[in-house]
């Protein structure tokens, strides 16, 4: 039965082929070649992607952050295919660039990359790289980048969006802040492991030893503990430190200042009310101390019972300190809160 059915099926297939239009054979041949070409192109893409990932994993095995020039940047970051996210720090670490902020940011970036490399969650979906200005000037020009350091996320597909550029000026460059930003952009959560830092412990031990030694040497005369002036000075120092934003600096880790790479101008005051530099805190601390000194002199001139001429001089000096430095402080406030209507002496 099966032997008799086979010839009949072949005859039916032959009849169907005879009824096909004559011009359909070139079309079928073209369609077959197109399918073969598409299959070959897809295989080529897969092989190219595998080679790129293998190369990136090899670099990552040697160091957590690999440096890139223009050619490597275009091949591994800009050119498809990609199935991985790339975090890139654009920086200027050469000594002649004199970018102290770049060195500080690089230390935090290294801590973050090492935390990812040695974590149990490490995989080939996220890599860390660096482009130095002196090694990839063409990359800076291609991206129209005019400041360093800058952190960018390049997603597996498509172009980077605005949120893929880390807001360093507002958030700071602490490794923990970078890890939060990366988790938001890639859904990869990195637990930051910092190397042990014993400087705080050593400083505390030295302070305790110094205080203990002082108390031991003065054990027969401890009246200085009840000195109101000494405790007032200590309290003022704490108040000046806290009102100048030192705690914000400790939490956010902002740069000390910002140097414009084009004209070399250094900014010590941040132009936004949402951020500040470390130098800005030092300036505010000095201004607050000077204003306080002026108020103390005014109080001394009003309450003391000395020579009238001397009291008048003290009063003028105190008034000058308060007016001058408070005007300076107010001008800084106006530069950060644009549109603030009040001012004293104009320093702008």
Swiss-Prot record:
GO terms for biological process: cognition; magnesium ion transport; protein N-linked glycosylation; protein N-linked glycosylation via asparagine; transmembrane transport. The keyword Nuclease does not apply. Residues 218-221, 298-312 are cytoplasmic. It holds the Pfam family OST3_OST6. Residues 42-196, 243-276, 334-348 are lumenal. Changing residue 102 to S: Reduces N-glycosylation of cysteine-proximal acceptor sites. Keywords: Disulfide bond, Endoplasmic reticulum, Intellectual disability, Magnesium, Membrane, Signal, Transmembrane, Transmembrane helix, Transport. One of its GO terms (cellular component) is mitochondrion. Residues 1-41 form the signal peptide. It is found in: Endoplasmic reticulum membrane. Coiled coil: none annotated. The keyword Magnesium applies. The chain crosses the membrane at residues 197-217, 222-242, 277-297, 313-333. It comes from the Eukaryota. PANTHER family: DOLICHYL-DIPHOSPHOOLIGOSACCHARIDE--PROTEIN GLYCOSYLTRANSFERASE-RELATED, TUMOR SUPPRESSOR CANDIDATE 3. Accessory component of the STT3B-containing form of the oligosaccharyltransferase (OST) complex. OST exists in two different complex forms which contain common core subunits RPN1, RPN2, OST48, OST4, DAD1 and TMEM258, either STT3A or STT3B as catalytic subunits, and form-specific accessory subunits. OST can form stable complexes with the Sec61 complex or with both the Sec61 and TRAP complexes. The association of TUSC3 or MAGT1 with the STT3B-containing complex seems to be mutually exclusvice. This is Dolichyl-diphosphooligosaccharide--protein glycosyltransferase subunit TUSC3. It comes from Homo sapiens (Human).
């Amino acid at each position: 039965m099966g032997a008799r059915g086979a010839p009949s099926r072949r005859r039916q297939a032959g009849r169907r082929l005879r009824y096909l239009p004559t011009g359909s054979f070139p079309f079928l041949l073209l369609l077959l070649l197109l399918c073969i070409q598409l299959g070959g192109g897809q295989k080529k893409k897969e092989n190219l992607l595998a080679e790129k990932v293998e190369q990136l994993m090899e670099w990552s095995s040697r160091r957590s952050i690999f440096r890139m020039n223009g050619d490597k940047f275009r091949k591994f970051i800009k050119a498809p295919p990609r199935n991985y996210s790339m975090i890139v720090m654009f920086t200027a670490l050469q000594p002649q660039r004199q970018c102290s902020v770049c060195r500080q940011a690089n230390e935090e970036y290294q801590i973050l990359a090492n935390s990812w490399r040695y974590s149990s969650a490490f995989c080939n979906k996220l890599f860390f790289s660096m482009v130095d200005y002196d090694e990839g000037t063409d990359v800076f020009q291609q991206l129209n980048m005019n400041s360093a350091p800058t952190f960018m996320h390049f997603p597996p597909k498509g172009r980077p969006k605005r949120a893929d550029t880390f807001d360093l000026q507002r958030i700071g460059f602490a490794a923990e802040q970078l890890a939060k930003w990366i988790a938001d952009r890639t859904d990869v959560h990195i637990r930051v492991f910092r190397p042990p830092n014993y400087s705080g412990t050593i400083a505390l031990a030295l302070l305790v030893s110094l205080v203990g030694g002082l108390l031991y040497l003065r054990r027969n005369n401890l009246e200085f503990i009840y000195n109101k002036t000494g405790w007032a000075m200590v309290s003022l120092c704490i108040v000046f430190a806290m009102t100048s934003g030192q705690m914000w600096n400790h939490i956010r880790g902002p740069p000390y200042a910002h140097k414009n790479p084009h004209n070399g101008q250094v900014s010590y005051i941040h132009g936004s009310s949402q951020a500040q530099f470390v130098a800005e805190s030092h300036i505010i601390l000095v201004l607050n101390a000077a204003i306080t000194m002026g108020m103390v002199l005014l109080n001394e001139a009003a309450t003391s019972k000395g020579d009238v001429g001397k009291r008048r001089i003290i009063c003028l000096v105190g008034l000058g300190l308060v007016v001058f430095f408070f005007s300076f402080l107010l001008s800084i406030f106006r530069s950060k809160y644009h549109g603030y209507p009040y001012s004293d002496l104009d320093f702008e």
